[in-house]
A protein has these predicted regions:
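Glycine-rich phosphate/pyrophosphate-binding beta-alpha loops
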Residues: 323-337
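Dinucleotide-binding Rossmann-like beta1-alpha1 core, especially the glycine-rich loop
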Residues: 50-126, 131, 243-244
Length: 353
């Protein structure tokens, strides 16, 4: 058996991908430096939200489903590693047109993912498209995202092989040499570099991506519905056009709704000057919550993600012998973070062998 030495790893970006990768590398015996231009965690990162949904079924994609089952398993274990409860396994319901349901259920059965059909009348406070059928995935639910980030940052700060460097903006990463340049002129080198700078990564990684901005609305349910929402699942395929989703409140969070209909392509991941009110209004009228007028609107916020310009997906790419990047961060970018972390640990282990 080949002995593995402790390698030096530099992670650029302390969102969920950077933090989990640092954690897994430290657990594997490597030395890790995490750089972020903001605090760690950074409230401006795209991971820093109340919650993110996790599900395992990728209809029609058994390999993708197998990977998400592995990610789900790792999230459960991470609750123990980090000593923090952050997963609300409330299930995820997706609304499907009747002619698609049989294929989705068959796809789940083939992949060994447990689902049940559901009459939308059983979830009267969620707005389903006319005629839709619900499919409920039980091995799914809500990750309390901020809680994950804070727990991971605490764990890393206490680990002797990890150095956290907040307020360190990276200005360039050379894919061939692996040199990492910081604002101020400092240069770092490592056996492996991961660029996990979220929507801002495109400034460091020269790969074509499409930048998207999406507005989310945070609401407090009326008192009389608080009990109902306590056990409600996350849900997708909602609203009159079937493009909206809802993440239920719980664990100290608010109800959140959004829709692909308010997702737009933008040129820059900075929306400080953009008025969110018109987008919030569209969301409120999307039919996600049948009695939306009874809910208290607490906030509207925009968040960014990127998709690969060719495939439309998120992507982990090897840019050079020792440089990797989460080149695009869209879709299931939070839930799938353990998969990126696992792949990087494998790559570091190869380098260190
Ligand atoms: C509206 C919306 C809803 C979503 N819902 C879900 C969901 O339900 N489930 C799911 O799985 N995913 C979801 N996602 C996707 C998910 O949130 C992201 O894919 C994921 O959080 C990205 O994490 P990250 O670590 O790659 O990037 P980020 O969390 O954005 O972290 C990047 C970090 O890099 C730092 N940084 C940037 N540039 C530099 C630099 N030059 N130098 C140093 N540091 C730098 C930033 O400060 C930041 O802290 C959603 C995304 C959006 C926008």
């Amino acid at each position: 058996m080949t002995a593995v030495r402790a390698a030096r790893v530099v992670v650029v970006g302390a969102g969920v991908v950077g933090l989990l990768t640092a954690l897994e590398c430290a657990l594997a015996g490597h030395r890790v430096t995490v750089l972020d231009r903001g605090t760690i965690p950074d409230p401006g990162s795209s991971s820093y939200d109340q919650h993110r949904a996790i599900r395992t079924l990728v209809p029609g994609d058994p390999e993708g489903t197998r990977r998400m089952v592995a990610a789900h398993r790792r999230w459960r274990e991470l609750e123990t590693v980090l000593g923090t409860a952050f997963y609300r396994r409330v299930g995820v319901v997706t609304a499907w047109p009747p002619d698609r349901v049989a294929a989705v259920v068959a796809s789940a059965a083939e992949a060994g993912v447990e689902v049940t059909r559901l009459d939308p009348a059983g979830l009267p406070h969620l707005g389903f498209p006319a005629g839709a059928t619900g499919v409920r995935e039980t091995r799914a639910g809500v990750l309390l995202a901020r809680r994950v980030l804070r727990a991971a940052a605490r764990w890393l700060a206490a680990h002797p092989a990890v150095v956290l460097r907040p307020h360190c903006a990276v200005t360039a990463v050379d894919p061939r040499s692996g040199r990492v340049e910081l604002a101020g002129g400092e240069v770092l080198s490592a056996d492996l570099v991961l660029v996990a700078a979220g929507p801002w990564g495109r400034e460091l990684v020269g790969r074509p991506v499409v930048l998207h901005r999406q507005t989310m609305l945070y609401l407090r349910p009326p008192d009389r519905l608080a009990r109902w929402w306590r056990t409600a699942p996350a849900a997708g395929g909602l609203g009159a056009d079937g493009r909206a989703w809802a993440v239920p409140p719980g664990g100290g969070t608010l109800l959140k709704i959004s829709s692909d209909a308010v997702c737009r392509e933008v040129a820059a991941a900075d929306c400080a000057d953009e008025d969110q009110a018109p987008w919030a209004e569209r969301l409120a009228l999307a039919g996600v919550l049948p009695d939306v007028g009874r809910y208290t609107v607490v906030a509207a916020r925009a968040c960014h993600y990127t998709t690969d310009a060719e495939t439309g997906g998120a992507q982990l790419a090897r840019l050079g012998p020792a440089v990797w990047a989460r080149a695009a961060c869209g879709g299931t970018g939070f839930a799938s973070a353990p998969l990126v972390a696992g792949r990087i640990v494998d790559a570091v282990t190869e380098v260190a062998a």
